[in-house]
């Protein structure tokens, strides 16, 4: 904004398929809901905060149990397991494969594509082993709190992961 640092910057979440709520603080529409951006209750933005403080706050959201970021939700909540399974699957399906297959990578983030490819190649064997370990898992997960449904099929995801690697290698 023109009056930065007296007003917080506007932050938009871009790894978004429009259907999956990847984190309670990261909305399907791209809204980032945290107090220091004045988009949630709590400690508000002050001019002594920086882009670095925003990035640190956002990093703190990226944890192994993101539903616990939602007030009143715990690992014992009714949607906890369904949400975990949905996010685990969609992080590989959408956030990795679809982005690398260039189905959904926003134009303004194309500059990060080489870094994404390198990370994928360096971690491909681990990803493939993980997906193969779940190859018999086929389910439909309903997450009531977000009216979210995810069709999970790790066997299909294994094929997509292989396709992604083939695509990346063909670009060399």
Q: Where are the regions that the model predicts?
A:
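Compact alpha/beta protein-protein interaction domains typified by the UBC
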Residues: 1-78, 98-101, 114-125, 129-131, ...
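Charge-rich (especially acidic), low-complexity segments
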Residues: 68-172
